Amino acid sequence: MPEFSVLNALKEAKLLLKKIRKLEKYKIILSLDSKFATTVYSSISLVRPHPKEVIDEADIDNLISQAIWRFFDRNRLKVAQKMDIDDVDVLLSDVRIRGIKLDGHKIVNPIGFKAKAVEIFFSQTFVVRDFMRGFRELLSKDSIALITETGTAMSHILSRALVRDRFFVANLFPNQTSVFLADSGRLSHHDSFDWGENDLTHLLDRYLHIDQATAKSLIQTYANGNASENFSRRFENILAKELQMFANGLESLSENEPMDIYLNPFFLMPPVVFTSRFNSRFQKPLKLLPLSTNLITEKFGYDVQFKKSAQVKNLFSFLAAFLEINFLPQNDKMSHLANRRVRWLVN
C-alpha cells in the first residue's frame, strides 16, 4: 500500500480528475483527510470602541479582518501540530461567515445597527501549503467550490439532521481512529488514537494463523449473520480483547458525562460494538451508534441512487461533502468580505 503522503494524494487526484469528461464544466468539492485539512466551526467575540456609532460596511470589514486574524493566530500552532507540519506551512484556504450576533442577538445583516459586542460565527479550513500548491496546478482556484475536512463536514451535517448540541463522530481507518467533537455549534477534530482494521486482522492472524484477506472474509461472514450461533459466540470472544482496546481509546478522549459516539468505519466493523453488552464495558457513560445514511436522507428528503459503475467507498462522507454545499451561508457578501481579507494569508 503506498505511503499516505501529499505527493501520493496529488497523484491519485490527478488520475481521478483525468477520468472526468469536460472537467471545466464542473465545480469541485475538496473533502480532505485530517492529515491535509483542518476545518473548525467556532466564533470570535470583539468589542467595538465606539458602540454608539452605526455599523457600516467599512466597520464590518474591519471586524471580520480582526476576527479572522485572531482565530488564525490562536489556532495555527495547534493545527500545525495536528497535521504534523511547521506552522509556516499552514494555509488558510476557505472562510465562511455562518452568523453574527450583536450584543447577544442574532442579526442577518449588521450594517445599520449599533452595538458594543460583536460575535462572528464562522467556519475556517486550514490546509497543508504543499498540498494546496500542488492541487492548484491541477485545477484553477475558480473551479473549487468548497474545501473542507471530511470529519468536520460529517459532524456539521449530522448536527443539522439530529438537531443536537453535543456528540462525537469517529472515523475508523486501517491504522487509526479520528474523533470529531460537536459541542454547541462548535465543530472540530478532537483527537486521534492508533487503532483500526489492521488491529482486527492481525489479531485473527495470531489466533487462527490466517492471512488478511481470509480474516476480512471471516469478519464479513460474521457481520452478515451467515455464521452459526456457536461460531459467532466463539468469534466474539476472540475479538473481545482487541475491541476492548478500541473502547479504551474512545474512553481516553471522553469526559465523564453522557456522550453518543457515531461510528463511521471505512471497513466492515463487527456489529457487536453496537450491542448493550459491549457498551456496558465502558467505565464512562458512552454509547456507540452506527452512522447510517438514513439519519440524513430521511431528515432532508433525499433518495440516493448510484450508477452500477459508481464506486463509493464511504457513502456518509460522500453525502456530507455534497450537502455542505447546500448549507453554505446565504449571505455571500459577508463570506466574500472574509475571503478578500485572507488573501494575504494564502500566498
Language-model features: locations:
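Short, charged, surface-exposed secondary-structure boundary motifs
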Residues: 199-205, 296-303
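Generic beta-strand/beta-sheet core signal
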Residues: 31, 182, 269-271, 291, ...
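Short beta-strand scaffold segments in enzyme catalytic cores
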Residues: 177-181
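Phosphate-binding glycine-rich/basic clefts of nucleotide- and phosphate-handling proteins
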Residues: 133, 137, 182-280
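Extended, H/D-rich, highly charged conserved domains that either
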Residues: 172-175
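Noncatalytic linker/hinge segments flanking ATPase motor cores
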Residues: 29, 67-78, 164, 187-194, ...
